[in-house]
Amino acid sequence: GVDREVCAVGGPCTSYELVFHDQTEVAFCGRDTASLRLFKETLSTSYYHISLTHDVIGLESAVALKNAYALAVAMTIGLVNRHHGADAGLHYNSQAGAFYQAVKEMRRLLKIQQATEDCENIGIGDLYVTVYGGRTRRIGILLGEGKSYSEAMDILAGVTLESLVVARRVAKAIYRKAELGQVSLQDFPMLV
């Protein structure tokens, strides 16, 4: 057989939309250009578009970070439900404000890791799709509505929620970097 390696696939893509052939842009990352090109040639379609990057750490970090920040943005949806009722119609200001702050913080974190700008953009696109169509949206809304962590976890029993693990781990890392004088906690209000 042929030995090929792709380190990660990331970007704004939900499987159910891919099944319907919705236009989708993702990135494949790895160190071997020939392997990446082969995968792109093999898997690209008229609706599944693939960018390539050698920035493995940047891409993997971007797609992980989006989970933590999507949780925070989704919580604003729950807050609106709690204060105005679930049938109050669409409220975008708080979501947009939280999304803006999430993008700023993600960019700062990715710069610390020397991620490429392309990986930043992939992470931002992934943040968008996760806020509006992912599992993280569900837990964020429940927490924003005032459910306790335990209540929300009971409601979503059996659902994998990377966002909670990522948020805790990234916050812990930021606190440590702040102790070392490498970052200011004021730059990361959504995490601290």
Describe each model-derived feature in a short phrase.
Residues 1-92:
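Rossmann-fold dinucleotide-binding core
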Residues 53-56, 60, 66, 71-81, ...:
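NAD(P)-dependent Rossmann-like dehydrogenase/reductase catalytic/cofactor-binding core
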